[in-house]
From Swiss-Prot:
SMART domains: SMI1_KNR4. PANTHER family: CELL WALL ASSEMBLY REGULATOR SMI1. One of its GO terms (cellular component) is incipient cellular bud site. This is KNR4/SMI1 homolog 1. It comes from Debaryomyces hansenii (strain ATCC 36239 / CBS 767 / BCRC 21394 / JCM 1990 / NBRC 0083 / IGC 2968) (Yeast). SUPFAM superfamilies: SMI1/KNR4-like. GO terms for biological process: fungal-type cell wall beta-glucan biosynthetic process; regulation of fungal-type cell wall biogenesis; regulation of mitotic cell cycle. Residues 428-438 have a biased composition (Basic and acidic residues). InterPro entries: Knr4/Smi1 (IPR009203), Knr4/Smi1-like_dom (IPR018958), Knr4/Smi1-like_sf (IPR037883), KNR4/SMI1_regulator (IPR051873). Residues 410-451 are annotated as: Disordered. Belongs to the KNR4/SMI1 family. Residues 410-422, 439-451 have a biased composition (Polar residues).
Length: 451
């Protein structure tokens, strides 16, 4: 017993493992008990009846795509790392040391998954970001945090609770033939007040999903949108799935993750990168593998689609001295600041629509309805003709122009404003230079005469 403690102490001093433990049974991360293995096996087998089709033969798909994206990860990271060293040492300092083989092995056992080799290669380069020394620099991916594997494990468990809850509800509704119960399930982020996220404590309470059901109405409940995927059929039409593994997060419930269980014969690939979360009723396919996604991010950096937003230390808006600020996506040429999730979403839609035009095939009614829905729900942030700052300033100006009913002497205020403007014009055009004291005295005397 004593020798075991001694060996454990020596292990803690000498190992480079961060996730893995000397005694796996005592690990805080050990969540994969025999019961949970059966649970996730049930998820994989029961997905067919709950989300519209049988699952893939995972083993054959894994063998086919196991090396996809590995070279791309190495190439993209070389460009990203060089960019960080040149432009953002603060962001570079948030990157953690690599994961060990033991870390990645235990991580996959805990979640009962096999990671794509390109993602394993990436975590052998860096274990995501740490916020202990971020200096206000924020997330690496244009403000989005690249999570270490321990945070990935915790967030995946939360999303699996979401999927388990929804599957049990849908299964109960199907077994009892009470389809009216489906209309009581909130499926949109806009209607759900019970889905809560925070950076320190991710709580998913009474989460929701719908699976290929038409819109339903119920007393006291508005029409609830279906969950859809872009392109259609590439991702399961569900709010959550136990085999969606979040990798990058905005820390308010939206994620960029990998899909380890795409629909059969739907055009998706094992290990594809998708966009999902509480604000996305539509799920978006943004890359075939994680290596391709990193190349997209690296290309945006190389193209100059970036800027740094000044960081604030506290509510008094004191600037952090020496801080680079948060990396944000700024469209080159227009100088528009756009959330990166919206950028990826827009590109996915444009690529899909372009493929439809190239095929010249007749669009089905479902495709036409989906295109119409996408056009009607396009985020207003993509329609700004000016920068984000200009948009905010215009709204502030319109607010300032509204009359305040509390003020009684509006005419006096307007008159005082006109007098002040006249004084400024006189001061600007006068050939005689006056000091600040004489200008103030002149302004006061003029105001007294008006009164």
């Amino acid at each position: 017993m004593k020798f075991g403690k001694l060996h454990e102490f020596i292990y803690s001093l000498s190992t480079q493992d961060k996730y893995s433990e000397f005694d796996p049974k005592k690990s805080f991360n050990r969540v994969n008990t025999q019961e949970t293995e059966l649970l996730f096996s049930h998820h994989n087998q029961s997905t067919a009846s709950l989300i519209g089709g049988p699952t893939n033969d995972v083993d054959s798909t894994v063998n086919k795509n196991q090396f996809d994206g590995v070279h791309e990860v190495r190439l993209a990271w070389r460009h990203i790392k060089n960019w960080l060293l040149k432009y953002s040492p603060d962001l570079n300092s948030t990157l953690q040391s690599p994961c060990t083989d033991a870390d990645l092995s235990d991580f996959q056992k805990d979640l009962n998954i096999k990671l794509p080799n390109c993602l394993i290669e990436f975590y052998k380069i860096t274990d995501g970001q740490s916020y202990f020394n971020d200096n206000g620099s924020g997330g690496l991916v244009f403000g989005l945090k690249l999570m270490p594997i321990d945070e990935v494990m915790v967030m995946t468990e939360h999303w699996r609770k979401v999927a388990d809850y929804l599957n049990s509800k849908l299964l109960h509704a199907n077994q009892t033939n009470k389809l009216q119960e489906l209309s009581k399930l909130e499926t949109s982020h806009a209607n759900s007040s019970q889905l809560k996220f925070s950076s320190s404590n991710l709580d998913l309470i009474e989460p929701v999903k719908i699976a290929k059901q038409q819109r339903h109405e119920s007393a006291g409940s508005p029409n609830i949108p279906r969950q859809k995927s872009i392109p259609p059929g590439t991702i399961h039409d569900s709010f959550a799935h136990p085999m969606w593994i979040p990798i990058i997060t905005d820390e308010v419930g939206n994620c960029i993750g990998i899909d380890l269980c795409p629909p059969t014969n739907g055009g998706g690939t094992w290990g594809q990168v998708i966009l999902f979360g509480r604000e996305f009723d539509n799920k978006y396919l943004i890359a075939d593998n994680f290596g391709d996604f990193l190349l997209i991010f690296a290309n945006d950096l190389e193209m100059g689609n970036w800027d740094f937003r000044s960081s604030l230390a506290n509510n008094n808006q004191d600037l952090l001295i020496g801080s680079e600020g948060e990396l944000v996506f700024v469209e080159k040429g227009t100088n528009k600041e756009i959330p990166y999730l919206e950028v990826l979403k827009k590109r996915c839609i444009e690529k899909w629509l372009s493929s439809l035009n190239e095929s010249n095939s007749e669009k089905s009614e479902e495709i036409k309805h989906l295109i119409k829905d996408l056009n009607s729900n396009t985020s207003s942030i993509l329609k700004f003709k000016n920068s984000m700052d200009q948009f905010v300033n215009n709204n502030i100006s319109s607010i300032e122009g509204i009359s305040d009913p509390i003020i009684h002497s509006e005419n006096q205020i307007a008159g005082g404003s006109d007098n002040a403007k006249n004084q400024v014009k006189l001061g600007e055009t006068s050939d005689t230079k006056q000091d600040d004291t004489s200008k103030i005295a002149s302004t006061v005397s003029t105001s007294d005469e008006d009164e």
